[in-house]
């Protein structure tokens, strides 16, 4: 399903709907959001503008954790999802986005990557 992307408001200040000058162009369409969750790794490859490929992470159970005290990065297993401060509905549904907090074997980790855009889960250990 295609989603409209940007563009002006559909209503005038009086409440009347703007007359449509033309149909939507392909480049004006968006895509469905990738609701990344904790689970067995599953990715989706999407062809984007210019023939490039964007990898969307649907599910993953491991995160690359950076420890600022030691200055090292380690791959750790996610024990459970804790919170997502960006959206309370995402927090309720357990959706991983940038800024989400998960519990790993090493401790609490804040996600720093954008899994729906990058296709990888990176995070920083929270003390």
From Swiss-Prot:
Recorded GO MF terms: structural constituent of ribosome
Pfam families membership: Ribosomal_S8e
One Gene Ontology CC term in the entry: ribosome
Alphabetical list of CDD domains matching this protein: Ribosomal_S8e
Keywords: Ribonucleoprotein, Ribosomal protein
Transmembrane segments: none
Any GO BP annotation: translation
Oligomeric and partner information: Part of the 30S ribosomal subunit.
Family assignment from sequence similarity: Belongs to the eukaryotic ribosomal protein eS8 family.
HAMAP family: Ribosomal_eS8
Protein name per Swiss-Prot or TrEMBL: Small ribosomal subunit protein eS8
Organism: Nanoarchaeum equitans (strain Kin4-M)
């Amino acid at each position: 399903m295609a989603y409209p992307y940007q563009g002006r408001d559909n209503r005038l200040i009086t409440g009347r709907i703007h007359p449509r000058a033309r149909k939507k162009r392909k480049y004006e369409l968006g895509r469905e959001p990738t609701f990344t969750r904790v689970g067995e790794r599953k990715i989706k490859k999407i062809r984007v503008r210019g023939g490039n490929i964007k990898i969307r992470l649907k599910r993953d159970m491991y995160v690359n954790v950076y420890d600022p005290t030691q200055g090292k990065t380690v791959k750790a297993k996610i024990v459970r999802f804790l919170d997502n401060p960006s959206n309370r509905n995402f927090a309720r549904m357990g959706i991983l986005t940038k800024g989400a907090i998960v519990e790993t074997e090493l401790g609490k980790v804040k996600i720093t990557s954008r899994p729906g855009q990058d296709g990888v889960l990176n995070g920083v250990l929270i003390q």
